[in-house]
Amino acid sequence: MENIISQENLVYKKPTLMNNVPMHYCPGCSHGVVHKLVAEVIEEMGMEEKSVGVCPVGCAVFAYRYLDIDWQEAAHGRAPAVATGIKRLWPDRLVFTYQGDGDLACIGTCETIHALNRGENIVIIFINNAIYGMTGGQMAPTTLVGQKTSTCPYGRQPELHGYPLKITEMAAQLEGTCYVTRQSVETVGAIRKAFEASMAGKGSSLVEIVSTCNSGWKLSPVKANEWMKENMFKFYPKGDLKDTI
């Protein structure tokens, strides 16, 4: 029997929390990668039965289809308010929102800032791809200066459209936040750290994940990743902006 069965070191496996269903995201989209990272962290922490996610309006509106945990859908931009209610009702739960730049940094700016300022023990996962992906590639609050979209075809002009909103830098200045960081899709450690801080009752955490939208950017997945590294990271540098944990 020992000659037939050989011991192997497991390098990778699909998280058991990931449902076996096709994703609706465009090929090359970063959302699928981030979903996997979130699932891995929840499993590592043993919080499968005590996690509650709040879905946004936007490309990730169907996130509840893909991770086998409890979910609640929220009205556009209101995910932090919904998460606040859930966490106050069930303080022993790991409660997080999963939001894009339009949902969080435009229509949901009020709910986001005030939840963070109150120090609600929730985690906000913020996907920043600098464009509105679901509705056709319009300019977002985070669209870079000079970046072309369907609603600013000549590029974002500060004198006309204003400057890109650095919502994460704003969050770092608030008294209620304990951990604010900006990372990219290869950084799983930041998500776990934020989840652990939430469960310890240390305050609000915001994890921005700089991502791609190859469909909205009109680039191939490979070119989109290159563009992200060459342009996005210059204006949205990676790293911890606040850490009081």
Mark where each language-model region is.
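Short coil/turn connectors at secondary-structure junctions
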Residues: V21, M47-S51, W90-V95, N117-V123, ...
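Short catalytic-loop micro-motif centered on adjacent basic/acidic residues
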Residues: Y25-P27, T97-Q99, C178-S184, L206
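Thiamine diphosphate
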Residues: V57-G133
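Short, hinge-like loop/turn segments at secondary-structure boundaries
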Residues: I69-Q72, A115, A140-L144, S198, ...
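Conserved thiamine diphosphate
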Residues: K13, A140-G201
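Glycine/aspartate-rich loop-and-adjacent alpha/beta segment that forms the canonical ThDP
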Residues: E2-N3, A190-I191, A197-I245
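Active-site diphosphate/adenylate-binding microenvironment
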Residues: S6-Q7, K14-A75
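Glycine-rich beta-alpha junction loops
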Residues: V57-C59, N129-I131, T187, V210-G216
